[in-house]
């Protein structure tokens, strides 16, 4: 018997996998495997590890239920998934603000928070600084979502725009406002771009700020 080898080539795009999942729901597992880790890390940085476990599962439950409405013109599902995640975070907005303010108070009084109380992953080191924690807490919802999608999720400005369903120029203006607020909170230090790994600040790759539209 002659066995025909499976065709080899680059992995199917997210859009192709999602389209296949319309008729074969089990194919959606590939989207979960590709993106769950990043989505969970983003949520952990926004709402803490315990809540992130539940919310990350909910992101993919919602995505699966809505997969037949996915825009197949978008080959990568990352912005879509981060948009769902950010919408879920909004339900925890007050809790998030209390977390940042508590971190700021504890740091100001020299009290070290437990690991469970720390904001996870890349933003944790930055959030533990009282001035920066207070600045993040003071930002409005939209102004806080933008820099954290850049900081924690590693999205560029265009991907943030797709995630939040807002114009590219609005992303740039919100990011600019957030940087200005953080600059003031850091005593004039220049946060010239997004947060990088371990709370470092670096320019957004290939992006120039534009007026909001």
Task: Go through each PLM region and give its residues.
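N-terminal module of bacterial RNA polymerase sigma factors
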Residues: 1-30, 34-38, 211-213
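C-terminal edge and immediately downstream basic/flexible tail or linker adjoining helix-turn-helix-like DNA-binding
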Residues: 2-4, 8, 162-165, 179-213
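Short, charged helix-capping/linker segments at alpha-helix termini
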Residues: 4, 22-30, 40-58, 72
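Internal acidic/polar
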Residues: 11-14, 100-125, 129, 156, ...
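Amphipathic, Lys/Arg- and hydrophobic-enriched alpha-helical face
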Residues: 31-50, 65-66, 136, 188
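Structural recognition of an alpha-helix C-terminal capping motif at a helix-to-coil junction
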Residues: 54-61, 75-87
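Arg/Lys-rich amphipathic alpha helix in sigma70-family domain 2
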Residues: 65-72, 83-105, 117, 125
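Helix-turn-helix DNA-binding module
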Residues: 134-145, 153-170, 181-184
């Amino acid at each position: 018997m002659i066995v025909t080898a499976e065709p080899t080539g680059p992995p199917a795009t997210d859009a192709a996998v999602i389209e296949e999942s319309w008729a074969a729901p089990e194919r959606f597992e590939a989207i979960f495997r590709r993106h769950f880790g990043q989505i969970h890390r983003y949520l952990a940085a926004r709402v803490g590890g315990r809540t992130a476990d539940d919310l990350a599962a909910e992101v993919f439950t919602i995505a699966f239920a809505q997969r037949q409405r996915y825009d197949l013109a978008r080959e990568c599902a990352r912005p879509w998934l981060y948009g769902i995640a950010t919408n879920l975070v909004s339900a925890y907005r007050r809790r998030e603000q209390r977390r940042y303010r508590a971190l700021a108070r504890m740091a100001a009084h020299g009290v070290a928070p437990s690991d469970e109380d720390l904001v996870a992953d890349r933003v944790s080191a930055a959030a533990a600084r009282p001035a920066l924690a207070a600045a993040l807490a003071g930002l409005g919802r939209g102004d806080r979502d933008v820099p954290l999608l850049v900081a924690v999720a590693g999205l560029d400005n265009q991907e943030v725009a797709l995630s939040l369903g807002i114009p590219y120029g609005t992303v740039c203006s919100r990011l600019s406002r957030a940087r200005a607020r953080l600059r003031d909170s850091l005593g004039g230090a220049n946060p010239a771009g997004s947060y990088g790994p371990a709370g470092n600040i670096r320019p957004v790759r290939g992006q120039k700020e534009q007026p909001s539209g």
